[in-house]
């Protein structure tokens, strides 16, 4: 009887040891979780949509031996109030880091306060906060590009194109009559792009005359509507269409195509961003040129920052400016080099 009890106890002890070892191995092998909360001003924005898809791929390619990365992506649809609520929801759900494409760059006190209270780092992207806000806390960062550079490059592309294609000056008056499709009322990038492209054209020796500047909110359909109105007003006097982004440049082209304007009366079109559709239009010589906004570089920087911020890793290899800003340079895209960028897309 005693022998039977002793054997039973030995079996139970052995089972407990096995259970303990098994649990210990599970704990060793168990990965830690990183939860990234993302909110965009408008996912219908073509460039933002492409940037987010690239960001998802970059996060998936990170070294995840120790961590599983999950992500929630929300669309503010242009509403800062909605975005504030989304940020609060993701914080309550336990996110480790926030990536925010602001709906309103001048109204982010609620977001920063909520993140600071829970010690959650924020990476703002594409729509740059004002310096005063970003300097409120050492866990606030920005990833994007310099809007002025895009305007300067766009102006240089326009000047080079017109010098090589003097027929753009259809009425032969020595001046280029142009219209601008601007991104958004009061938006920093839109204002800076418009100002810098105008300055760049003048600095590169062009004589120019602005016929109109219309707000189209970065949107292809709105740009088509605005351009249709401008064609009705100015008829064949428009020699150049400058758009703050590719989507609006393509919308302007849509207007001419829908109205059936003869090719000899169609102006030259220039955009910014190098979206998939924009690059295709350059390949087809419908869009004279664009300026490439490096979404791959921005997505990579965002993913690295998010990973390091969430895990407490060293950021010494991040190429910051003023310890907070990561800027990726723009690049000029013409029919001569567009395939280099399209290849990168594939």
Could you tell me what each predicted segment is?
Residues 111-149, 168-174, 275-283, 287-288:
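Flexible loop/hinge segments that line or gate small-molecule binding clefts
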Residues 47-63, 150-154, 188-207, 222, ...:
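Short, solvent-exposed amphipathic alpha-helices that sit
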């Amino acid at each position: 009887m005693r022998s039977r009890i002793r054997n039973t106890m030995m079996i139970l002890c052995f089972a407990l040891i096995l259970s303990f070892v098994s649990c210990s191995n599970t704990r060793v092998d168990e990965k830690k979780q990183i939860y990234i909360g993302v909110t965009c001003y408008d996912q219908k924005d073509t460039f933002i949509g492409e940037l987010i898809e690239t960001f998802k791929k970059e996060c998936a390619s990170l070294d995840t031996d120790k961590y599983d990365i999950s992500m929630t992506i929300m669309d503010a649809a242009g509403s800062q109030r909605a975005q504030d609520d989304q940020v609060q929801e993701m914080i309550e759900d336990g996110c480790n880091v926030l990536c925010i494409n602001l709906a309103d760059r001048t109204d982010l006190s609620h977001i920063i306060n909520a993140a600071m209270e829970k010690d959650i780092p924020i990476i703002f992207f594409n729509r740059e906060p004002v310096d005063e806000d970003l300097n409120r806390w050492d866990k606030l960062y920005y990833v994007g590009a310099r809007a002025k550079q895009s305007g300067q490059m766009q102006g240089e592309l326009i000047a080079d194109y017109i010098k090589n294609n003097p027929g753009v000056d259809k009425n032969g008056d020595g001046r280029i009559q142009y219209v601008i499709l601007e991104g958004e009322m009061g938006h920093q990038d839109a204002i800076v792009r418009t100002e810098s492209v105008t300055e760049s054209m003048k600095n590169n020796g062009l004589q120019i005359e602005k016929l109109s500047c219309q707000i189209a909110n970065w949107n292809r359909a709105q740009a088509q509507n605005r351009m249709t109105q401008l064609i009705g007003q100015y008829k064949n006097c428009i020699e150049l269409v400058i758009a703050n982004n590719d989507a609006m440049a393509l919308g302007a082209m849509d207007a001419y195509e829908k109205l059936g304007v003869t090719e000899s009366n169609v102006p030259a079109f220039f955009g910014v961003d190098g979206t998939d559709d924009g690059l295709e239009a350059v390949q087809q010589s419908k869009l004279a040129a664009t300026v490439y906004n490096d979404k791959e570089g921005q997505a990579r920087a965002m993913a690295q920052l998010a990973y390091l911020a969430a895990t407490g890793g060293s950021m010494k290899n991040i190429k910051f400016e003023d310890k907070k800003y990561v800027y990726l340079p723009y690049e000029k895209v013409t029919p001569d080099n567009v395939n280099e960028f399209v290849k990168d897309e594939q």
